[in-house]
Amino acid sequence: LIWHLVQQSNLMSNKNFDTLIIGSGLAGFTLALHLAHTKKICIVTKQSVDAGASSWAQGGIAAALSTNDSPSKHVQDTLIAGAGLCDEAITQYIAENAPRAIHWLIDQGVHFTSDHSNETGYHLTKEGGHSMRRIIHSGDATGKAVQQVLIEKIRSHPNICVLEHHIAIDLITSDKLISHAASSHKQCFGAYVLDKQKDKVYTFTAQNTVLATGGASKVYLYTT
C-alpha cells in the first residue's frame, strides 16, 4: 500500500532508503547499527554528526550489573525517585534491558572506567535515588566516549549514509499526498530535507522513518 500511494501521488524521490533516521544522537546511532546489517540506512542531522547533546552527558549509565543488584531493585529505586510520574512498563523494560545494552556498547569498543576490585571489572558509582552502585561510566565524559565509538562505526559502515547540515522540514504523509486516503491507512513515506549548505530541498523516501531528535524541550516555555 505504501508504494502504491506514492505512485498515485506522482511523488518524485531524490533518494530512497529502507530506514530514514532524523537525528544523530546515541539513540539514532544505536538503531542504525542494529539495522544496517540488512537495511540501507540514512541518518540526517542538522549540524555536524558530533554536535548533538549526547556528547554532553557526563555522569554515566545506570544498569544492574553486580550479582547483588537486579533489574527489580533498579525498577523499585526508579519508581520511588519518580514519585508517581514513571510509566511502570517502560521503567521495567529499560531496567531489564540496561545490562544487555551496556554489554553491546562494550562489544562496540566503548572503554568504561575499570576497577579490578569490582566483580564486574568496572568502576560503578552510586547517584541520587539509587540504593546500589550501578552507574557505569567513562571518566566524567561518558556520553562523549560512547558517541565517538559509535560515530566511527557509523562512518565505516557501507550501508549507512550520513548527511550532515541537512534538516528535515516536513514529514511526507499519506494524508498530505492523497486527500482521499483512508485515515486507517495513514502512513509516513519519508521527509522533505533541506540541504543547509546548498539551500535546496530534497525528497527522501523510506519504508520507515524514525524521529531521533532528542527530548521534547519545548513542552514547557522554560526548561532547565
Language-model region placement:
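Extreme N-terminal leader/targeting segments of oxidoreductases
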Residues: I2-T19, H37-T38
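Core beta-strand elements of the Rossmann-like FAD/NAD(P) dinucleotide-binding domain
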Residues: K15-F17, D199-N208
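A short, small-residue-rich loop immediately preceding and capping a beta-strand
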Residues: D18, T45, Y220-T223
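N-terminal Rossmann-like FAD-binding beta1-loop-alpha1 element of flavoenzymes
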Residues: T19-I43
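Alpha-helix N-cap/helix-initiation motif
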Residues: S24, G139, D199, V219-T224
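Structural detector for helix-capping/boundary residues
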Residues: S24, H166, Q207-N208
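Conserved N-terminal/central alpha/beta ligand/cofactor-binding core
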Residues: T45-Q197, A212, K218
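Glycine-rich loop(s) and the adjacent beta-strand/alpha-helix scaffold that form part
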Residues: N208-T224
